Amino acid sequence: MLRRLDNIDVLCADLDRMVPFYRDVIGLPFVLPYDRGEGWAGFQAGDVTIFLIEVGGDAPTRRVPGAGPPGLESFAFAVDDLAAAIAELDAHGVTWAADVVESPWYRYRSLYDPEGNVLHLTVPDRKALGLP
C-alpha cells in the first residue's frame, strides 16, 4: 500500500526567512518554480519534496481542520560525512541544538531552522536498522 514518503509540508510564519535557509544554507534545489506571491516553496531532498507553506497573517488558511499547530517535531537529512556537513553549516552560522549524538542506529547532530524547527543531520547504521 504505502511505498515511500513523497512530501512533507512545513507550515511557517515567515517564508522570506525560511526560503534562503533551505535554499542557500541547507542547499536544497527548488522542485517547482518559486513565486513568492503563491505563499509556498517546494524543495527537493532526495526522493522527498519539502513544501514550506506560509500561514498566519494575510496568508490563506491551509491547515486541515483539527490539525496541530504550525511546524513539526523534527525531520532528518542523511549525509555521507557528518563532520564535513557540520563544517559546511558552521560556515553559514547555523544554530546547533545539541552536540553530536552517538546512538545504536544513528550518528547525528541537530540544528534549528529560522523558525525553530529541528533538523537532524544523520549517518544511519544501515545494518543496525536492518536495512540493505
PLM feature spans:
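Conserved active-site tyrosine of GNAT-family acetyltransferases
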Residues: 18-25, 89, 116
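Short, conserved charged micro-motifs
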Residues: 17, 82-85
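Conserved A-loop
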Residues: 9
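Short glycine-/small-residue motifs
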Residues: 118-121
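Conserved beta-strand-loop-alpha-helix junction that forms the acyl-donor binding cleft
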Residues: 12-15
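Vicinal oxygen chelate
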Residues: 1-5, 29-77, 86-112, 123-132
